[in-house]
Amino acid sequence: VRNTMDAKADIGIAYDGDTDRVLMCDGKGRIIDGDIMLWVIGRWLKSKGTLGSGVVATVMSNMVLEDLLAKEDIKVFRCGVGDRYVLDTMRKENSRLGGEQSGHLIALDYANTGDGLCSGLLFLRALSDLDEDISTLSDRFDRYPQVLKNLRIENKDRVLGSIKLKEAEENALNKLKGKG
């Protein structure tokens, strides 16, 4: 971020160690994460007629992604965290784009796994073709308050397999539907 701002560049691009994730920042140093990239690339793929049934996002993605894509008549399919869950849901729902807030994106027409270089290039192409200004994306992607918390569980399989937990989760999801 600092290098982008010091260089007075419009955009900064960063990859993780094995280059399967990409994050960016605009010239003001605001982070462009996977949620924003899914929003932009999803709209672009829809405009080209190659999106498929919608966009796959994990439960960690901010609800504003779902709301903004809904305004474009793009459905969001939610899945568990991890690229294997994203890919499984993409195949199940016939989606061509999916990913995580962390910048781990999969665009099946270009690669069958997360590829940060490919995702970064797709995002830049989408920005160009949609005539988007990267400096306005963060303002328009006005995130809802969100708390992400990891919990350590000793007997994960037993706890996650609990019928009471599944019922509580289903009840909570039904109450929150469309609200968070």
Feature names for model-found ranges:
Residues V1-C25:
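N-terminal small/polar loop signature for handling phosphorylated ligands or for N-terminal nucleophile
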Residues Y15-G17, I31-I36, A111-G114:
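Short glycine/threonine-rich catalytic loop with a Thr-x-Gly-x-Asp
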Residues D20-W39, L65-E66:
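Short Gly/Thr/Asp-enriched flexible loops that form oxyanion-binding sites at enzyme active sites
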Residues V1, M5, R43-K46, L173:
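Generic structural signal for well-ordered alpha-helical scaffold segments
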Residues I36-L51:
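Structural motif
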Residues G17, K28, I36-M37, M60, ...:
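Short, ordered loop/turn segments at secondary-structure junctions
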Residues I11, S47-G180:
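Phosphate-binding and adjacent anionic-ligand microenvironments
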